[in-house]
Each structure stands twice: as C-alpha cells, then as structure tokens.
Amino acid sequence: MALGFLTTHVLDTARGCPAADLSISLFRIDGASRHHIRTMQTNADGRTDSPILPQAEIAVGVYELVFAAGDYLRVCGYDADSLFLDDVPVRFGLTDADQHYHVPLLLSPFGYSTYRGS
C-alpha cells in the first residue's frame, strides 16, 4: 500500500481566519475526462477532518481540487451580485504515491493563492 495522502488547508485572508464550511470536490483527470472522487467540507480550522485522498486510494496521476469559494463568500456576507470568484479549480500532478501532498488555498473575495505545502 502507498504511504502518501492528500490534504488541504483553506484560509480566509480577508477576514484573517480559517475558511470553515467550505465545500471542496476532488476529481481525477484522465485525458479529457474528469472523474469525481469525493466532496468534503472544511472544519472550523479550515481543514478537512480526514485526508481528501487517503493512503488506501492515492495513486500517481493528475487531480483537481475545486474549492466552492463563491458559496463560501456569499455565506460570509459578501454581495452575491459583485462576487469576482466562484469555483476555484486547482489542477496538479501527484508523481509519487508515497509522499504527502498538501495543497493550501489562501482565499479573499478578489483573489487566491496556492502552493505545494508540507
């Protein structure tokens, strides 16, 4: 069994807090096809309660996390008619099934940043 897994952490940089109750969907990309694996919610710390892709399921390949930023921002009180961001897709490759991959998202109403964390 592979030893790696995939996690995330979402921070609301405009409010200076974790982005709680934000929906995240994980897809595996196979050529032109996109296969839904699961959808999870962030907890009060802006993390998921378990890995988005656990050890038993991780495999080398291309994946996409889709962060439901628009829904989250509307719940936070931002005007739905003036929102700049909606779904935020982050596509990345996993090249070693024995590594821990961490994909943080720093989110604000008008921009976001991501990187490979540790």
Briefly describe each language-model feature range.
Residues 33-49:
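Short, acidic Ser/Thr/Gly-rich low-complexity loop/linker segments typical of extracellular
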Residues 14, 30-32, 71:
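Solvent-exposed strand-loop boundary residues in beta-sheet-rich modules
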Residues 37-41, 53-55, 79-80, 90-93:
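Beta-strand-rich interaction surfaces with strong enrichment in secreted/lumenal proteins
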Residues 26, 44, 56-57:
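A short acidic/small-residue loop/turn micro-motif
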Residues 1-20, 28:
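Beta-strand-rich domain onsets/edges
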Residues 50-61:
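Short Pro-Gly-centered beta-turn/loop motif in secreted/extracellular proteins
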Residues 60-118:
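Feature of secretome-associated and extracellular-like proteins
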Residues 23-27, 64-66:
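Beta-strand signatures of extracellular beta-sandwich domains
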